[in-house]
């Protein structure tokens, strides 16, 4: 079973246990496995993972301190630790675990290709993750540099410009339609057109239409559709 699927199953079990235990979770171990990521060992049921970001870093640090105090006290007594969270902490921990599931799914998509924030939001929403979790996850991924609208825009432009001959204006409009901010779109276009002559793109487009036997009016109409200004089209024709 994939790790994210396993964690999803474990969280489902945890939700059931939470209902049966008057909305509190008891844990016997907390282990940090990566920066900000922890494996939680409940006293009953399978382990699950949480990221401190989703619990609230300060809140999680406080939780760790409380757990360590109980852990060392129990160890001195020779007893097995069973640290019971408050109802609020239990619900926060459950939310944090579910948010981590959304993060795992998002990272799977990002590992395959660049994503925009809007596009990734829609994909997570389609998987039925809660909007509150989605926004927290996207904030975290942006903060960590895993998610970038600028990188997405640059990658999208490289692919688009290889397959289509369009003006900068047309490409700018297409990025805006993909919910990229005006500032980010302009920045990505500056990079994409750094060594590209827009007039050369138009000239190649016109030549391709001429070779297909299109008349002047049809060529003008098609070139304008791709965002090129009429004045420049007439000049090159």
Name what the model sees in each region.
Residues 1-237:
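An alpha-helical, amphipathic repeat domain used for nucleic-acid recognition
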